[in-house]
């Protein structure tokens, strides 16, 4: 499918505690339908219902979709796996392209000026990146909040409880939005293989092998 044919996009993100699904018009970023459920332990369970509800809000069906955009993190292993596997499955089943984007870019790309973006990385750490007028200049990375260098940032966006750890004004957006995800795509490029941004080893530990 050529770039000019892509009009209606399914955007999903499971890199944060929010399970986000939305239907977006590519050319003007108008959100036709959106559902968000905040539940860090139910990404897999909530994503499909949210996708179907967003389609219903937009009065569309799966057959009306031209592309899928998915946030590839950084984020926890289990959450990312749910969103990226679903995006790949939708693309394969519908025969449409799937584009992966940095979830932090879906937040930072909607900011102006010098902005720090942070999201929850668990283990008392944050995923972060710095932006200047919506363009990422540093990151993504994962650190304890105290070890994050805000640099020239004049504001902080992202997870409110973690943004509050910095001596900076908090601004929106607080999570990746469907419009932000679609805006983060370079539509001039061909879709590339989806690569998750874990930035560290999964929390789950392998079981010991009995001998």
Swiss-Prot record:
KW Nucleotidyltransferase (keyword) present: no
Signal peptide feature range: 1-20
Superkingdom to which the source organism belongs: Bacteria
A cellular component term, taken from the record's GO annotations: cytosol
UniProt KW keywords: Signal
Keyword ATP-binding applies: no
GO annotation, biological process: tRNA threonylcarbamoyladenosine modification
Pfam families per UniProt: TsaD (PF00814)
Family as reported in the entry's similarity comment: To M.leprae ML0378.
Protein name: Uncharacterized protein Rv3421c
Organism (species): Mycobacterium tuberculosis (strain ATCC 25618 / H37Rv)
Taxonomic lineage: Bacteria, Bacillati, Actinomycetota, Actinomycetes, Mycobacteriales
């Amino acid at each position: 499918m050529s770039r000019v044919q892509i009009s209606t996009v399914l955007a999903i993100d499971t890199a944060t505690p929010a399970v986000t699904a939305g239907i977006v018009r590519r050319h003007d970023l108008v959100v036709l339908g959106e559902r968000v459920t905040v539940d860090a332990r139910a990404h897999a369970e909530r994503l499909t219902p949210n996708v179907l509800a967003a389609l219903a809000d937009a009065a569309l069906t799966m057959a009306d979709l031209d592309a899928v955009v998915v946030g590839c993190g950084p984020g926890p292993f289990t959450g990312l796996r749910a969103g990226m596997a679903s995006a790949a499955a939708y693309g394969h089943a519908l025969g449409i392209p799937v584009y992966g984007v940095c979830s932090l870019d879906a937040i930072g790309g909607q900011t102006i000026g010098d902005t720090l973006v942070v999201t929850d990385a668990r283990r008392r750490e944050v995923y972060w990146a710095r932006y200047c007028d919506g363009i990422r200049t540093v990151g993504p990375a994962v650190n304890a909040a105290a070890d994050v260098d805000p640099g020239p940032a004049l504001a902080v966006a992202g997870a409110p409880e973690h943004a509050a750890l910095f001596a900076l004004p908090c601004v929106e957006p607080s999570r990746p939005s469907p419009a932000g995800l679609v805006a983060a795509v370079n539509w001039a490029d061909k879709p590339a293989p989806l690569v998750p941004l874990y930035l560290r080893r999964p929390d789950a530990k392998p079981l010991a092998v009995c001998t």
